[in-house]
């Protein structure tokens, strides 16, 4: 019913009204678009030609002319308002165009035929046909645009945020095409349904157009940002182009630097390096001349130049020159002025030359490359002067090339200096190597001499002394008179001291240092004093001295200490006193010292740190003094003055002091007015030994009347030693003295065959670890492999303490230290038999 009330004139008026409303909305909310909608408003009546002709007038829809003029004046920007005379003309044309559209076509006499009855080119029928074809083509074009958009835009994911805009735009285009398609059916008589569809299509087109315009409010700022971003990207591209140009220049400069560095480092001669630098720089930078000025004795001397005709007369510039001071005080390239003396001396004042540049080159020292704390060395600088041709200016890249090349030249010169120093060092090392080889040969010869000395000492002194000690120990077991026993015990103790001294000498020759090992064990102090007094009496009688000994009765007897070292020190004290003075009388006093603090002749205080006698320790004081005769018989054969030097005695006294200090004691001497020793005092602190353990005393030379153990008697012993001298005989006699049955192979090399032939014949094997032709440790190892059960027991004889540790790893049951003494042999055999 509503549709039936719509007439063509009413429909045309509503369309114009709708467009007016849309125009008002955009002009109200978007003032910047007023000029464009003004033009749209002027062309609005002419766009109505696609509507069918209507019979009634609809000019009442438009505003009056005055109001239309005001509306256009409001819509026009201020810059267009100056031309107000155009507004009446434009407003007059707009109603005329609308009126021409609203009248029926058969009242139009446009083709001159009137009524549209003519058949010319511009007849109404021809115009309608052309409009119909145009509408169909426009519709086809509109319909093809969405297809093209779908074909080209469907796969672009970055346009997904704009898909709603694309949908609206596509709908707008489709509806516009549909409007033109329906309009093509209105040029001929058509039913009302076509008009209704056309109206609906136009309404939807207007609605979609309105929505699309609203959507563009949010899209246009984004497009503007894209434009701004495009501008920024364009600026960034220009900056990148400039950076690429700079990078190319830097790459070119780097290539030149690498080439120059390669040429400079080809040689390690300083003159070749400098001349190569001058030549290559002149080729790369196109220089006229290059010069190198070296410091020498407060002046700068021209040492290297590309061409010699450009230098000064003498080629010398003072180091206090302003340009020289400025160049040497800066790191970069400095341009010299036109009045520079340095530039003139380098050929910079000639015709055809440009601005002269100069740079310093540090002359690095060899000590700069050595490790450790660097030395404070004043850096020396050379000056490189560059003379370009006329018209050439120094750019930043050229200056960078010069700076890098100057650094490379400094490094190359330092390498050349280092090479020269290394060559000199190589020569010195070669000389030192020759000296070391000579020292090595001398050391080998000294080692051979030392080994020969040790061999002579071992064969000529130690082995005979060991034999003497063994024989003396056998004599001690015999029934002797008291005087005889005193002499024998003294001989045994003296031989023990000599053996200890020989061992000390051999150890010092092997280790090249003084070593005095102590062997602390229980001993009888009274017997040791008695033997020392006996030897001292013999020495005094030989030198024409009288001798007396006084021993305190309260002196302890069983003490713990190293009796050999104490005996040695006492003999040294006696020898030192009687060796430097005229004949007189020697007195030996031995007493228990008090616990108070004792002072020596040097004022040094020695405070015993051990407990008193009642707590198990006792201090013993030995004082040996000499009283010279006023009128000695110089012609007596017993009065002989030794010819020893005082320095030797002082050295010997120093060694004795060291021994005493190792035993936690002290020793000092008192001299007379002539500087000769008058008395010597020795203070020692001993640990007391309980009488219950007197049976464990070792090394005592008193007579033992106990008979051999029943286990030792009849023991079958195999004695292995490749030496056929007196030592083997003494060892055999000692074992036979204890009641053992002793056998020995012909040599050490035949030992294994003896063991294989009579495996159960021996109960004990004694091996000498100091055999020459056979390694005793290998023999002991083979014995431990062949034996089974409790056979045989292995015991080794050695004088070297280092060999004792190896014996425990080789399966040796016991160690007997040389010299072999009867009582020690008996005690060791008893211990081994008891433990196994």
Swiss-Prot record:
It is a multi-pass membrane protein. Cu cation binds at residues 176, 180. GO terms for biological process: negative regulation of ethylene-activated signaling pathway. Keywords: ATP-binding, Coiled coil, Copper, Endoplasmic reticulum, Ethylene signaling pathway, Kinase, Membrane, Metal-binding, Nucleotide-binding, Receptor, Transferase, Transmembrane, Transmembrane helix, Two-component regulatory system. Residues 718-834 form the Response regulatory domain. It is an enzyme of class 2 (transferase). One of its GO terms (cellular component) is endoplasmic reticulum membrane. Its main location: endoplasmic reticulum. InterPro entries: CheY-like_superfamily, GAF, GAF-like_dom_sf, HATPase_C_sf, His_kinase_dom, HisK_dim/P_dom, HisK_dim/P_sf, Sig_transdc_resp-reg_receiver. CDD domains: HATPase_ETR2_ERS2-EIN4-like (cd16938), HisKA (cd00082). The chain crosses the membrane at residues 137-157, 166-186, 204-224. GO terms for molecular function: ATP binding; ethylene binding; ethylene receptor activity; metal ion binding; phosphorelay sensor kinase activity. Residues 269-413 form the GAF domain. Belongs to the ethylene receptor family. Ethylene receptor related to bacterial two-component regulators. Acts as a negative regulator of ethylene signaling. May delay the transition from the vegetative stage to the floral stage by up-regulating GI (GIGANTEA) and RCN1 and cause starch accumulation in stems by down-regulating the alpha-amylase AMY3D. This is Ethylene receptor 3. The lineage of its organism: Eukaryota, Viridiplantae, Streptophyta, Embryophyta, Tracheophyta.
